[in-house]
Structure formats: structure tokens, C-alpha cells
Amino acid sequence: MALKRSSSMKTQLVDAIQLEEVEMEEEITTTSNNNNPVEPAQVKEPKCYTVEEAVESIGFGCFHILLFVIMGSANIVEAMEIMLLAVVSPEIRCEWHLEDWQVALVSTMVFFGFMVCGVLCGYIADKYGRWKVVFGGFVWASYFSFLTSFSTSYGWFIFLRCMVGCGVAATSQGFVLKTEFIPAKYRAYLLPLASIFWMMGSILIIVLGMTVVPTMGWRWMIRFSVIPSLVLIGLFMFIPESARFQVSAGNIQGAMSTLKRIAKMNNGVLPEGELREPEVTERGNAVTLISSAFRRTSLLLWYSWFVASFSYYGSVLSSSELLEKNLLCVTDPDLEHQIKHIQEETLCYCIPFNSDDYQTLLISCLGEVALIPLNIILLNIVGRKYSMVILLLLSAFFFMLVNICTTMLGFTILLFLLRSVVSMNFNVVYIYTAEVYPTSVRSIGMGFCTSFSRIGGMIAPFIAQVLMSKSVILALSPFATACIICAIGVFFLPIETRGRALLQDA
């Protein structure tokens, strides 16, 4: 009996030990699971993707062609409003008996409006959306441009053109809107083609000058020039808000609708899963532009934009001035002064453009697109940064060559090449700026840059239209010098954006 009781106690003791071991194993397993809560075999995370991945997955298609045509047409409107100044200058000089500085002030006031509103429009675009700003800019610019044709005095004319400059500042945000929809590998091919539309706008205003001004006057030319803006206002309804902005503003549902619409038009597919990206609360914060991450980039870009505008409008207005005052091959300042004022004693001492002058301006406009293939090759092979360096040095070279005494054909060829390289440089600066800044500050970054560019545009008329009367080489040298200094600065830009995904937040 005692033996049986002893055997039973041993059995109970063994069972107790085994039970304790099992409990310890379960505790170890539980602890292990707590330390490693995600096991691929046990828990599956839902798939998610970003806007960048969605844009790359959808690819290029019909939507981008529509985007290219409509947003490219915005360049037509902008070019017409800016190039209008070169065509109308001889006419208003005659009508209101203006001095050189007064004619130059017209261009300066347009760029002043652009400069003041550029930063404001960039801030609003980052805060409330790109689409609203661009659409409002078209309406604003067309309205005040139309009012310009009814100007009764020089004062009203420059005020209304200043208001037009504010509207054009808003439309420049269209480049940001366009960039944010294009896949990375296509940006270097599509964005340079914006020059085609700029050329079309320049040609259109020159053709209007040739046909309308001699018969109906400059006022009707301005009225006709508003028509493309009105057409574009209707077409712009087909362009959606930027999906990148919608995500940064926390509007995931709106971004999904936009991406689905693009995918449907392109016959593309969205990545598997759901769109997920954190909301950016600090949107449109200008302090980011001068933070340690972007300080050197911003400072160099601001000067690059200044020079891009300074050299571009310098080339446009210099050619206009040389043709209007017949200063080609005139190197003696006294003779220049004599030619300039040869008709000053008459009632109207302006010298309007003739057909040959208009033809020269037309041919020089073609230079803005003739070298687009070279621009695309440079962007894809040497990148954005070194493309700017090369183009700036070429710009300086051709600015000095324009001063060489040659025939009208030789002058036209030099002008053609000069307009090619300065417009190519302007285009590359646009592309680099849109790519280097994150979505949270892309528009205000572009706004600051365009504002600095308009400072260059404000100064250019006083050199190209006022200093030109003193000495041709004295007027052309500042443009060449600025390009050389800028080329050195661009070399030290810290970021190359070729093939780089667009950042969402800083």
C-alpha cells in the first residue's frame, strides 16, 4: 500500500514538472511574439504607393498630350504679353512723344507687377492649389490687357501694363502644374518643347504688328492679342488640380480621382494597394528656401533667374532698338546720337518698324526653337547644371558678336543664334527649379525665382533702350558679363536633378 502511494506521488510530481515546462515554453513564445509583432507569415500589411510611383506606373499617354497642348498654350499668351512691348514701343513713342527712359519704363512696370505678384502667387499656389492661381492669372491678364487698348495717356498705359504683369506672374505657375504630372524620364524631352509655344506667341504678336498696326493701329493689335487668352480660359477646364498638391494638402480622395482619370485617359494602371502619403502641414513656408538644405541652391538660383531674364529681354529689346534706330555698324557715339534724333524736330519723331524689321524679328524668334534638339541632348547627357553653364557661356559669346559690323543677313544670323541660346538657358532654369524644390515649397520657390528674374527684366530696358543710344558695345557688355559670372556660380550648384524623382517634402 505504501509502495503504491509512493508511485502515485512520483507520477503527480512528474506531471507537475511537465506542466511547468509547458507554461514556461508558452511564456517564452508570447514574449518572443511581443518583441517581434510583425511576422510576414502571420500578418500581411496592406500595399500602398505614393503619387510619384503612381505617375511612373501610369506612364505617358493622351492626358500628357492634352496637358502639353493646353499648358503650352499658356506660353503663347505669356509670350504675346511680353513681346507686345517690343512691337508697340515705336508706336507709343510716336503717339505720346516719349523719351527713351519713358519707353523703357513701360517694360519695367510690367516686370515690376510680375516681381511683386510672383512671390504672392507662389505662396497661394502652395497653400490653396496650382490650378486656381493659374486660371485666375489668365482671367486677370486678359482683362487688364484688353483695358490697355483704351489707355488715354501714358500714365494709364504703364499702370494697366503693370496689372498685366501681375496676371502673367500667376500664369507662370502653370509650369509647376505641368511638371508635377510628367514622369521623370519624359521631363527632359517634354519641358524644353515649351519653347515652341513661346515662339508661336512671339510670331503671332509680330504678325499682328505687321498686319494690324499699319492699318488699324496698335490699340486694335492689343485687342486681337487677347483672343488666345479667352480661348485658353475655356480649355483650362480640362486640366485637373495637381495630385501632388492634393496629397500634400491631405486630400487623398481628390488625388485618387485625379490619378484614376489620368490612368483612364492613358490606358494605364495604378499600382496595387492604396494611395498613402503624409499630409504636409508646412506648405508655402519661405523659410525652407533659405534653410541649410536649400540655402546655396536658392541663392544661386535667384541670381541665375535674374541673368536668364536680363539676357533674354536684353536680346529682344536690343535687337528691336538696333533696328528701330538703324544703329547697325555705327560705332561713333556722336553719329549714334545724330541718327537717333534725326526726326526729332518733326511733329512725330518715332521711327516705326518697316517690313524688313518685322521679318528680322520673325527670323530671330525661330531661333528659340531651332536648337531644341540640342537642348534635349544636353539635358539628357550632361544634365541640367552643366547645360546651364554651357548655354550661359555661349550667350556671353554671341552678345559680343552682335556688336560686330556686318550685313543685315549676318546680323540676322547672329541674332538668331543669340535668341536660341538665351531662350534655351531660360528653359533649363525653369526645369531645374521645378525639379529641385519639394512639392511643399515648389510654387513659392518658383515664385521667388520669377520675382528675381523680373528684376533683370526691369533693368534690361534701361540698358538696351537707353544706354544703347550712348554706345552699342557699352550696352551689350553688361549682358555678356552677367552671363559669364552666372556660369561660374551655376557650376557650384549642389544638386543635379537629371532623372531624379520629385520630392514631396523637405
Swiss-Prot record:
Query: One MF term in GO for this entry?
Result: transmembrane transporter activity
Q: Which gene encodes it?
A: svopl
Keywords, ordered alphabetically: Membrane, Transmembrane, Transmembrane helix, Transport
Q: What is this protein called?
A: Putative transporter SVOPL
InterPro entries named among the record's database cross-references: MFS, MFS_dom, MFS_sugar_transport-like, MFS_trans_sf
**Any Gene Ontology CC annotation:** membrane
The root-end lineage is:
Eukaryota, Metazoa, Chordata, Craniata, Vertebrata
Q: Which family does it belong to?
A: Belongs to the major facilitator superfamily.
Coiled coil start-end: none
